Amino acid sequence: MPQISIFVEYEIHDGRGEEFAALIKDHARRTLFEEDGCLRFEVLKPVEADGAPIPNRMMVSELYADQTAVDLHGSNPRLAIVRAALGPLLKSRKVTRAEVIDEAEDEGLTPDELNASNDG
């Protein structure tokens, strides 16, 4: 089964950005801790080409091991609580799901292969 990537773009009401950021960062941290199938959960701040932050916008990028992991995430009771808390802060939310078609191959040494003979 392919890995599943989820991108969510948020438009936030004026003056609610800090509150939103605190909630979504906590959600990301808890999801990574609670859900083994969540491989990555990044909170992103979109920027212009010159690096200037785009006001009232945030994004998340999530990576799940497979569709089963996505389904488990969707059934996590905490998700409904988080969505209810975020709802009043949002003007809009756009979700894009994608299957990973070219997974990165493991490179380098695995933790089991690390030892003093590799130091040199």
Please provide the spans of the model-predicted regions.
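Short, well-ordered beta-strand segments in beta-rich or mixed alpha/beta enzyme
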Residues: 3-11, 42-76, 111-112
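Non-catalytic surface loops within mature trypsin-like serine protease
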Residues: 12-14, 66, 99-102
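Glycine-rich beta-strand-turn "strand-cap" elements at beta-sheet edges
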Residues: 2, 42-55, 82-120
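N-terminal first-folded block
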Residues: 4-43
